[in-house]
């Protein structure tokens, strides 16, 4: 990007910025504003450039914080911006770039000033800065004008009403960024903000009727994934005839004052990363996640969450029995396609989770798709590369699978989808496998990874719950999937024996010893036995419900039959072992009768014949395994820090000093 730190530092001495932050009041009608706002450069697109820019202008911002109570210059700048935006929609339609250019520049400065304000002063003090007027020190305006609310309303209006074109891309991105910055006080608090003046302004008053339009626009920005136009697309172009007086003034200022800002460089070649990026889509998604996770006000449920919860498909003509004022309609096919294509990012996975969990219309639509593999495969790839992902991303992917496996139709259909050559699955060549078998392989691999590395009980529980939900519908399991189920049981069995041995030795060693407390092996044993019980229930569910569909499962069971002997008489497993024991005995006898040295093909043939002959009434019926995902109490304690960690790590052109962050630790995102 080529940000030049030496020239960035010159900004602190820039005469226009010094005047803005100085001790003299500037009227909204002065030519100063045309001079200040006539600069040309590309907005920073990464945190490194933003850090340089913030460091270069920090002294200016601090001066404004000190002098604004007497000058009211922040309010004057905002009023200038508001006046420039009045003609924006017409300017966009008429390709009038001057208004858009100056409005963008005004908003860019406002956003950078407020960004520093939020890290230096409280939310209440910030709102007070919007009220200061020139004249007497500390003099502020009457209640008839709420400048902060006007700015908030203007930003939302701008996002929802200005068409997305090359020349409006930058100002739309800046408006979305400005809303994120205004909400960023949460970053500097360890506790979750339940009461916030800024939140109240968003959820009530003139902003409230725009809730559904804002959510819809942010979603469409995500769906469209519009690439950033070449740097300088929003800038007033050089005219061959020299242009008019206004252009001449703007051009002179741009070349003489602001060329120190070489972030990206106007007209410089974008890097391949820039060419591929869709900053507006990314920033819109981050804002949507932040808004939808705001806590409810005491007298007002979060309207953004309501909007996310109740929106419907454009092709849905039915009348909702309980219409919500913040609902809207959007093209679900386009949304589904975008969700499938973008799952490599945490924020897209969090959006998918949010929609599947909260919006029953989206969940019903997704489960009815005939191309479910387009959504499931990216989720499985996230889990397969578990070591490269943060724990939150893995959790979201797992919970998405758990939600999907709550549906019997999903559990049946995934075994009918045949995949060829899954290139990212490198442990074994899978030339042909069903989506269901691949799902089983990846979930089991995740459990095994967790057993050896993180040892997270919560992760185990979700993995096993997904397998349990699927187990009654297992169909034509791939031989490798069947082997891995039994291999996992083998691993658990060895772990059980090891813990049992440690507990026995510990007990012997503690006799006659008065030393410090020993490890709680009883608790370890209890946990491992819970997991073993769950695995036995999954195997049992497959055998009792779909044995005749799964010869490979019976084959794997018989091949490792000795694993199950030690659990036959164990009081925790006796009941569930009855069916497994009976199946092993039944098929072992038939194989003995078939003769010695049987080929794999012949063994499978005997199993298939035996499956038809096995009396179903000999298998004891157990309750169907059904697990449902339930969000924990106070979900905001997890989701608000997670959403903001994504803003911190993935926000376009946003930098916060890591030492100022209180909401989460740097390794949690």
Curated annotation (Swiss-Prot):
What's in the keyword line of the UniProt record? Cytoplasm, Golgi apparatus, Lipoprotein, Myristate
Explain the post-translational modification: Myristoylated in vitro; myristoylation is not essential for protein targeting to Golgi compartment.
Q: Which GO cellular component does the record give, naming just one?
A: Golgi apparatus
Coding gene?
Answer: dym
Its subcellular locations are: Cytoplasm; Golgi apparatus
The protein's superkingdom reads: Eukaryota
Protein name, UniProt field: Dymeclin
Instruction: Could you list the residues that carry lipid attachment of the N-myristoyl glycine kind.
Output: 2
* Functional description taken from the UniProt entry: Necessary for correct organization of Golgi apparatus.
Lineage, please? Answer: Eukaryota, Metazoa, Chordata, Craniata, Vertebrata
- Please name the InterPro entries in this protein's record: Dymeclin
Q: What protein family does this chain belong to? A: Belongs to the dymeclin family.
Task: Name the source organism.
Answer: Xenopus tropicalis (Western clawed frog)
């Amino acid at each position: 990007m080529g940000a030049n730190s030496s020239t960035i530092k010159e900004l602190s001495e820039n005469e226009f910025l010094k005047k803005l932050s100085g001790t003299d009041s500037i009227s909204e009608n002065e030519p100063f504003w045309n001079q200040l706002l006539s600069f040309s450069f590309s907005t920073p697109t990464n945190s490194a450039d933003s850090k340089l820019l913030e460091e270069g202008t920090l002294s200016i911002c601090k001066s404004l914080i000190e002098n604004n109570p007497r000058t009211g210059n922040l309010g004057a700048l905002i009023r200038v911006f508001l006046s420039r935006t009045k003609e924006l929609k017409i300017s966009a339609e008429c390709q009038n770039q001057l208004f858009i250019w100056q409005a963008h520049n005004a908003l860019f400065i406002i956003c950078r000033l407020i960004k520093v304000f939020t890290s230096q002063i409280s939310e209440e003090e910030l709102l007070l800065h919007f009220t200061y007027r020139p004249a007497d020190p500390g003099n502020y305006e009457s209640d008839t004008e709420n400048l902060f609310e006007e700015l908030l309303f203007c930003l939302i209006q701008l996002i929802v009403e200005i068409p997305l074109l090359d020349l409006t891309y930058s100002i739309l991105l800046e408006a979305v960024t400005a809303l994120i910055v205004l909400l960023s006080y949460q970053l500097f608090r360890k506790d979750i903000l339940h009461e916030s003046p800024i939140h109240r302004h968003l959820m009530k008053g003139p902003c409230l009727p725009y809730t559904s339009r804002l959510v819809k626009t942010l979603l469409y920005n995500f769906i469209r994934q519009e690439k950033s136009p070449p740097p300088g697309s929003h800038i007033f172009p050089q005219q061959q005839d020299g242009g008019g007086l206004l252009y001449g003034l703007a051009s002179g200022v741009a070349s003489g004052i602001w060329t120190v800002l070489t972030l990206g460089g106007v007209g410089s070649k974008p890097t391949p990363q820039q060419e591929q990026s869709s900053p507006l889509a990314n920033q819109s998604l981050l804002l949507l996640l932040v808004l939808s996770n705001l806590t409810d006000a005491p007298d007002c449920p979060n309207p953004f969450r309501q909007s996310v919860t109740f929106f419907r498909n454009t092709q849905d003509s039915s009348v909702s029995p309980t219409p919500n004022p913040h609902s809207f309609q959007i093209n679900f096919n386009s949304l589904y396609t975008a969700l499938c294509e973008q799952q490599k990012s945490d924020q897209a996975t969090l959006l998918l989770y949010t929609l599947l969990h909260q919006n029953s219309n989206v969940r019903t639509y997704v489960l009815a798709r005939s191309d479910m593999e387009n959504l499931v495969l990216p989720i499985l790839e996230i889990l397969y590369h578990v070591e490269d992902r943060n724990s939150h991303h893995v959790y979201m992917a797992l919970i998405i699978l758990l939600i999907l496996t709550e549906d019997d139709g999903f559990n049946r259909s995934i075994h009918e989808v045949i995949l060829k050559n899954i290139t990212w699955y490198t442990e074994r060549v899978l030339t042909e496998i069903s989506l269901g078998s691949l799902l089983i392989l990846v979930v089991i691999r995740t459990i095994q990874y967790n057993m050896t590395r993180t040892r997270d009980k919560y992760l185990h529980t979700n993995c096993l719950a997904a397998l349990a939900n699927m187990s009654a519908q297992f169909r034509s399991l791939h031989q490798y999937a069947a082997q891995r189920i039994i291999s996992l049981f083998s691993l658990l069995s060895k772990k059980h024996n090891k813990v049992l041995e440690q507990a026995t030795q510990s007990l012997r060693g503690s006799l006659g010893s008065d030393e410090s407390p020993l490890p709680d092996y009883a608790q370890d044993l209890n946990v491992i036995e819970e997991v073993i019980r769950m695995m036995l229930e999954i195997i049992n569910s497959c055998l009792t419900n779909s044995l005749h569909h799964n010869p490979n499962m019976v084959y794997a069971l018989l091949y490792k039959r000795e694993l199950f002997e030690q659990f036959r008489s164990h009081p925790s497993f006796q009941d569930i072992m009855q069916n497994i024991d009976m199946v092993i005995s039944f098929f072992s006898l038939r194989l003995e009768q078939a003769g010695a040295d049987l080929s794999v093909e012949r063994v499978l043939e005997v199993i298939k014949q035996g499956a038809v002959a096995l009396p179903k009434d000999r298998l004891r019926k157990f309750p169907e395994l059904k697990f449902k995902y339930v969000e924990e109490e106070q979900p905001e304690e997890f989701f608000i820090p997670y959403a903001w960690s994504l803003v911190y790590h993935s926000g376009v052109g946003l930098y916060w000093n890591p030492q100022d962050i209180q909401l989460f630790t740097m390794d949690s995102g």
